[in-house]
């Protein structure tokens, strides 16, 4: 790729002491040509960040004017506590100038990430609710605390949500769209995951408030830069509403490792928003992919109805980064336009945890920082053949059953 050759050429002439880190350009998976995410150093102030953005915009405009290069330049800015950066389409000269700037920590290529669920055929039963509320498999009743997550808000950072679906009982609202101007779920994945964590009939936490944050399109894909923007919006919305500590992000998205996305996820957690993240469906070590490479957040693997790690098409990732396992195979839930259907993937496992945390927050005042640990303490050692280095702990809501 031409942009990769340009980066190599730039690095060959930059003094090592002056160059910011430039990450993962040798891995071409999902790369969006000429598009970059630039992350600044942690100690930069908000005022200095604004000044830097203005400087970078000016540098780009001057460079493209000289060379008549049709690149968009600055497209998104990110400011989540100590995580500050921006994304855009920049030419070689601008990239050279950015790399030399002492405020820049690292630059990485923007890439496409994907929904982590796979649609399955058939009319599978919704067995997940019964499984997480019983210590033994095979039960169909769902036993849960009567608060059912009342007063807690879950942000579905996904493909959007069909907020008018009867499954949500008027509790779902449209938040923001960072992918296109079509404010609905074109893919189905976001509606399915939202109904799993918060649906009236198929959901874990039946009284939560649900907010749609669209970052993926009709093919279930979106750039990391859009996804980071969605994470930022969710955190800022929770802050503005005064619900930090009572807010959750369900993150059923994943893809090639992105340090910028990892840092944004960690920043969301540090701000007081719990993140339940799908481990990924590559049948590989979760540490090789985002969100598995992010720290602090809770990373969830997928089991089937017999308590085995799912190893079929779209096999669950595994490894030391898995915090918990949850039902994610043939999960029946809502789909757009009033429909219902099954899906399989770690995407379906993560919302079981998101909903369970909502109930813990509502009923017991569990904090963002301690929620994943509390669930691990409550979990049962039930998962069979979880994979090398993996925990065998299965999500359990402590119902006493």
Swiss-Prot record:
It comes from the Eukaryota. The keyword Nucleotide-binding does not apply. Its EC number is 3.4.21.-. Residues 35-112 form the Inhibitor I9 domain. GO terms for cellular component: extracellular region. Transmembrane segments: none annotated. Glycans are attached at residues 250, 397. The active site is at residues 158, 189, 347. Keywords: Glycoprotein, Hydrolase, Protease, Secreted, Serine protease, Signal, Virulence, Zymogen. It is an enzyme of class 3 (hydrolase). PROSITE patterns: SUBTILASE, SUBTILASE_SER. GO terms for biological process: proteolysis. Its main location: secreted. It is found in: Secreted. Residues 126-401 form the Peptidase S8 domain. Residues 20-116 form a propeptide. It holds the Pfam family Inhibitor_I9. One of its GO terms (molecular function) is serine-type endopeptidase activity. Residues 1-19 form the signal peptide. Belongs to the peptidase S8 family. Secreted subtilisin-like serine protease with keratinolytic activity that contributes to pathogenicity. This is Subtilisin-like protease 10. It comes from Arthroderma otae (strain ATCC MYA-4605 / CBS 113480) (Microsporum canis). The lineage of its organism: Eukaryota, Fungi, Dikarya, Ascomycota, Pezizomycotina.
């Amino acid at each position: 790729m031409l942009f990769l050759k340009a980066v190599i050429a730039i690095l060959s002439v930059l003094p090592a002491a002056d160059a910011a880190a430039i990450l993962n350009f040798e891995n071409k998976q999902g790369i969006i040509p000429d598009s970059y995410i630039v992350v600044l150093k942690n100690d930069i102030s908000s005022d200095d960040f604004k000044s830097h953005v203005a400087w970078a915009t000016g540098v780009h405009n001057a460079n493209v004017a000289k060379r008549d290069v049709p690149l968009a330049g600055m497209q998104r800015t990110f400011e989540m506590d100590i995580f500050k950066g921006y994304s855009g389409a920049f030419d070689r000269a601008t990239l050279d100038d950015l790399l030399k700037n002492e405020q820049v920590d690292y630059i990485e290529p923007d890439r496409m990430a994907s929904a982590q669920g796979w649609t399955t055929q058939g009319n599978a039963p919704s067995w997940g609710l019964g499984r997480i509320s019983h210590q033994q498999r095979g039960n169909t009743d769902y036993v849960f605390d009567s608060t059912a997550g009342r007063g807690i808000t879950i942000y579905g950072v996904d493909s959007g949500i069909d907020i008018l679906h009867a499954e949500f009982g008027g509790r779902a609202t449209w938040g923001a769209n960072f992918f296109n101007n079509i404010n609905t779920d074109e893919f189905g994945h976001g509606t399915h995951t939202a109904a799993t964590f918060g649906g009236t009939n198929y959901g874990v936490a039946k009284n939560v408030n649900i907010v749609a944050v669209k970052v993926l399109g009709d093919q279930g894909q979106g750039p990391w830069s859009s996804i980071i923007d969605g994470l930022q919006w969710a955190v800022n919305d929770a802050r503005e509403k005064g619900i930090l500590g009572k807010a959750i992000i369900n993150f059923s998205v994943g893809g090639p490792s992105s340090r910028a996305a990892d840092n944004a996820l960690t920043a969301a957690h540090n701000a007081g928003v719990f993140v339940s993240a799908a481990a990924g469906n590559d049948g590989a070590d979760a540490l090789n992919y985002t969100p598995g490479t992010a720290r602090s957040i809770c990373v969830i693997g997928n089991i089937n109805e017999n308590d085995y790690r799912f190893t079929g098409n779209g096999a669950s990732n595994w490894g030391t980064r898995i915090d918990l396992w949850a039902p994610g195979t043939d999960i029946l839930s809502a789909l757009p336009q009033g429909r219902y259907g099954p899906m399989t993937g770690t995407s379906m496992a993560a919302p079981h945890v998101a909903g369970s945390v909502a109930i813990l927050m509502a009923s017991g005042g569990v904090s963002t920082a301690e929620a994943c640990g509390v669930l691990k303490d409550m979990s049962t050692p039930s998962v069979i053949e979880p994979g090398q280095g993996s925990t065998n702990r299965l999500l359990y809501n402590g119902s006493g059953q």
